[in-house]
């Protein structure tokens, strides 16, 4: 494991470039002692930690035209442009199963970075149990 922090930016579909770089890290079996992900970067970080090469590109392209994934329909019906239930429950638990077991074996630290809507400041949420922590966010 590299004793280094990896910071992964957000940016929606622009994050697919990041996903490609992380796929290379998976190929080379590169692990980092700490990872920080913002928005799409947090999603791709989880794919890196679970060693699911190709998952970032696959899920983004496969569901891109699904109105439940990201759309005005989702925004109007759920209040979120990205359908939270579809993206964080249906895809990883049914349609493209996430490898929670491999993630749970990660010995480094993983953080999802988010903005506190009251203070406007960044907050770092450590992800220990991916299934519980992500659904809870």
Regions found by a protein language model. Give the residues of each.
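Patatin-like phospholipase
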Residues: 1-38, 46-137
């Amino acid at each position: 494991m590299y004793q280094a922090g990896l910071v992964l930016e957000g940016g929606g579909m622009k994050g697919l470039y990041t996903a490609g770089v992380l796929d290379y890290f998976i190929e080379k079996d590169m692990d980092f002692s700490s990872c920080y992900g913002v928005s799409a970067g947090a999603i791709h970080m989880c794919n890196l930690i679970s060693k699911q090469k190709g998952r970032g590109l696959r899920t983004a392209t496969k569901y891109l035209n699904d109105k439940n994934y990201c759309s005005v329909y989702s925004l109007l019906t759920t209040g979120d442009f990205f359908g939270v239930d579809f993206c964080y429950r249906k895809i990883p638990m049914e349609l493209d199963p996430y490898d929670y077991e491999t993630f749970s074996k990660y010995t480094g630290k993983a953080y999802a970075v988010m903005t506190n809507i009251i203070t406007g400041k960044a907050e770092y949420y450590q992800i220990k149990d991916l299934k519980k922590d992500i659904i809870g966010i």
